[in-house]
Amino acid sequence: MRRIDSCFAELRANGRKALIPFITAGDPSLEATVPVMHALVRAGADVIELGVPFSDPMADGPTIQRSSERALGRGAGLAYVLEAVHEFRREDATTPVVLMGYLNPIEIHGTRRFAEAAVAAGVDGVLLVDLPPEEAGETRAIFTEVGLALIALASPTTSEQRLDMLCSTAQGYLYYVSFAGVTGASNLLDTHAASDRLRQLRQRAGAPVVAGFGIKDAASAAAMAVDADGVVVGSALVAALADAGEVRSARERAEAFLAPLRQALDQK
């Protein structure tokens, strides 16, 4: 959690926006995950969101669903994800890593056991898509005890009552879903409507607010970042990596995809 806080504090001090790429652990290959993470950092990533493959990713669109299926087919379970973070930490002790996934694998593992293992591996935060904030108290308490941030999600359809709860309990950063839909549906992105909401959230939240869903390139990243503390790019990056046959190709594609987004954010 401290790495996330330090990262955003430094960005804020320098007037910069956070660039947060999402990749699925184990895709395009088991061997590529850690090299791609390092490549993303070289290209300008401030935080890395690492997707935990799951068999029923209900909030994800076809691109990430297929990516998750491919990763699961290679054996990329929770143990693999934690080992990948551990390996990443051998060379990178500063870039925050946030796991993004669903509650079921965590519950099977045991929440406390998972939290302790995640921190030991070098994970800084966890975003559980299907954990309602009203039911998150016990999980948050365990995570806080071990130093793990529970990242919350808000969307255009989130009620005011729930927003109050999310803003008052936000840890690490608050992830604002720019539209009510699944990941990758960029045709639904309305930057004007999202900007209004982002301005409101940043005034209310006790943590930085980042925007995701529908961001696919430098232009959409720059537009969304105007009123956010950072942006998350996922489906477009996952698609760019999908058929990278070798680790070298995956590294090169990751850097080539992300570098223009970093440049666009730094021009704002």
Swiss-Prot record:
Pathway given in the UniProt record: Amino-acid biosynthesis; L-tryptophan biosynthesis; L-tryptophan from chorismate: step 5/5
EC number of this enzyme: 4.2.1.20
Reactions this protein catalyses: (1S,2R)-1-C-(indol-3-yl)glycerol 3-phosphate + L-serine = D-glyceraldehyde 3-phosphate + L-tryptophan + H2O
Keyword terms: Amino-acid biosynthesis, Aromatic amino acid biosynthesis, Lyase, Tryptophan biosynthesis
InterPro entries: Aldolase_TIM, RibuloseP-bd_barrel, Trp_synthase_alpha_AS, Trp_synthase_suA
Top EC group: lyase
Pfam family, one: Trp_syntA
PROSITE patterns: TRP_SYNTHASE_ALPHA
Presence of the UniProt keyword Cytoplasm in the record: no
Gene Ontology MF term list: tryptophan synthase activity
Membrane-spanning residues: none
Superkingdom of origin organism: Bacteria
A cellular component term, taken from the record's GO annotations: cytosol
Presence of keyword Amino-acid biosynthesis: yes
Residues at the catalytic site: 49, 60
Family, per entry: Belongs to the TrpA family.
HAMAP family: Trp_synth_alpha
Purpose: The alpha subunit is responsible for the aldol cleavage of indoleglycerol phosphate to indole and glyceraldehyde 3-phosphate.
Oligomeric and partner information: Tetramer of two alpha and two beta chains.
Protein name: Tryptophan synthase alpha chain
